[in-house]
Amino acid sequence: MRTLIATIAVFTAMAAAAFVLTPRAVDACAGLIGSNGSVNLGRTTTLAAYSGGVEHYITAFQFQGGGGEFGSLIPLPGVPTKVERGGDWTLQRLLRETAPVGVGGSGDASGVAAAGGVEVLQEVRIDALDLTVLKGGGADVAVWAEEHGFSLSPDAPEVLDFYATRSPIFLAAVFDAAAAAERGQVLGDGTPVHITIPTDNPWVPLRILGLGKQSDEFVGADVFLLTERQPAWLPAAGDGLFLSYYGQATDLLLDDLRADAGMGWMPETAWLTKLEVGSTAGDLKYDLAVDASGEGRPSFRSAGLIPLPNTGGAEDDASMPWAWLAVAAFAALSISLTGLRLVAGAVRR
C-alpha cells in the first residue's frame, strides 16, 4: 500500500512536502515510510510568486532514499491553468539571496469524473512524478486517495475538510522511487514543479505540513513570496512563523530568476519576503494568507483563523474589526523591528 504525504511546497512552491499520511500498520513518524522502505523528508522550500492576478507556486519533490511509491497532497487556492516542470535553480537562487549576512510538461484539462465524487481536472507526468489535479470535498478526496492505494492518517478527514471548505482543489503527486532510480536520479535529486493558478491573492497551505505527525513533532519550512507590491499576511510573524527577509528584490536576482526555465513572466520589479515555519504540528493550525494589493488586508478566512459560515462563528473578515486592529499593531511592530533590520543587512551585502 502506498504512503501519502501532504506538502506545500512552496509550493511553494508555493514547495512543497512535510505531512505524513502513514500506512495503517505504521504509527505516524517524522519520516516517510514507503511500500519498500523508508524515505526521509527534508525541509520544505516553496515559492509563491504573484504577478498579474496569477500565483506561480513552485516547489520541489526530493528523492532521499527508499523504494516503492509514495505520494503527497497539496491544497490549491484555485484551478491551475498549467502544471509543468519548474526551473532548475529558482529555489536555490532564492535561498542563496536570503542567506544570513556573513554566511556564505503541461497536461490537458480532462474533466474526467472519478469515483467518490471527485473530478479529475488534469493529469501530468514529470520525470518520476505522476501529478493529478482533483476537485472535490474532503471526504471525496479521501475516498479517491484510498481507492488509489493510499492509507490516510487519523487526522486526515479533519484536515482535508479544513481545506475543501475553502477551495475544493488539490494536487495529488505520486513519486515512484523505483522509476527514479531507473532514470538515474540519485539521493538528493529533486523534481521542481511549477503550478500556475489564477487567484485574487497568493496563498500557501501550512497546516497540511503537520498531517499525520504527532502533536509535539517539529515542522520546518521556508516560504518565499515575490509580489509586485509590499505584501501583508496572516498570521503575523510570531510564535512558529518567523520573518527572516523583507525587502526590494534586486535587479540581479530578478534577472537570474527570469533566465530560468519557465520564468519569463517575472516582473521588472518585485518585493521579496522570506518566512520560516518552525512549529510543532499541534500548534500549526493555520495557513499563510497574503494580500498582494498593497491595501494591507489579508483574509482571516484564507488563513484558517475564522470558521466558515457553515461551521459557526464569524462569517467574514469584516466582522472582526478588533482582530484587524490587533493584527495591524502586531504586524507593524514585527516589520519595524525585524523586517527593516533585515533590509539593512541586505543592503550591506
Identify the residue ranges that each predicted region occupies.
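C-terminal segment of classical bacterial N-terminal signal peptides
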Residues: 14-25
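A cross-kingdom signal targeting lumenal/periplasmic-facing segments of multi-pass membrane
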Residues: 80, 84-127, 135-141
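Surface-exposed, glycine/proline- and aromatic-rich loop segments on solvent-exposed faces
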Residues: 42, 49-98, 145-167
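Cytoplasmic C-terminal tails of single-pass
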Residues: 344-349
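Bacterial N-terminal signal peptides that target proteins for export
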Residues: 1-11
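Accessory, solvent-exposed terminal regions and/or long lumenal/extracellular loops of proteins
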Residues: 27-44, 51-53, 79, 152-331, ...
